[in-house]
């Protein structure tokens, strides 16, 4: 299976931190501090990149137009411009050619918290906008992108229940 896991930073991420590694893993911002097996780290905000410690065993990615010696660039057409680290991570999974993308830790419409909230300067705020939801809905319509969550979220496509993901994942 040409699949990957994409880790968003919602509270449900904590439920997946001890999963054994089976697929390529893409995470956002400080993910390495809580899950060392991640392969790719994505950061949307250019000013935050200097706060993320780097390892020689990981690949670091940023949005279009912000690459550096240690940060590679995720390329996308204007219609697919990501608006946060989570959507940027999904866009990277698409760029890398994964046919199945499992999204873990996405709690849009259920929680506005981040597992890294104490590291951010701003207070907790709504993690999604209508345009972010429409973008994810558009991507999920034509591709095998599965949001794993037991709650009803903001998307048109229903989330995959956690038990179903666990069965497919082989636990």
Where would I find each of the regions flagged by the language model?
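Metal-ion/cofactor- or nucleotide/acyl-coenzyme-handling active-site neighborhoods
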Residues: 1-171
């Amino acid at each position: 299976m040409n699949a990957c896991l994409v880790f968003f930073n919602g509270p449900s991420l904590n439920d997946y931190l001890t999963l054994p590694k089976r697929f390529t893993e893409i995470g956002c911002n400080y993910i390495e501090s809580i899950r060392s097996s991640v392969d790719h780290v994505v950061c949307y905000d250019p000013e935050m990149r200097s706060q993320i410690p780097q390892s020689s065993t990981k690949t670091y990615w940023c949005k279009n137009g912000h690459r550096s010696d240690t940060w590679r660039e995720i390329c996308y057409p204007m219609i697919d411009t990501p608006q946060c680290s989570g959507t940027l991570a999904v866009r990277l999974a698409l760029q890398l050619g994964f046919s199945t993308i499992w999204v873990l830790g996405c709690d849009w419409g259920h929680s506005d918290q981040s597992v890294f909230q104490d590291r951010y300067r701003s207070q907790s705020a709504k993690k999604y906008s209508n345009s972010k939801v429409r973008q994810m809905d558009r991507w999920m319509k034509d591709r095998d992108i599965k949001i794993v969550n037991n709650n009803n979220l903001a998307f048109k496509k229903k989330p995959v229940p956690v038990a179903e993901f666990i069965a497919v994942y082989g636990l």
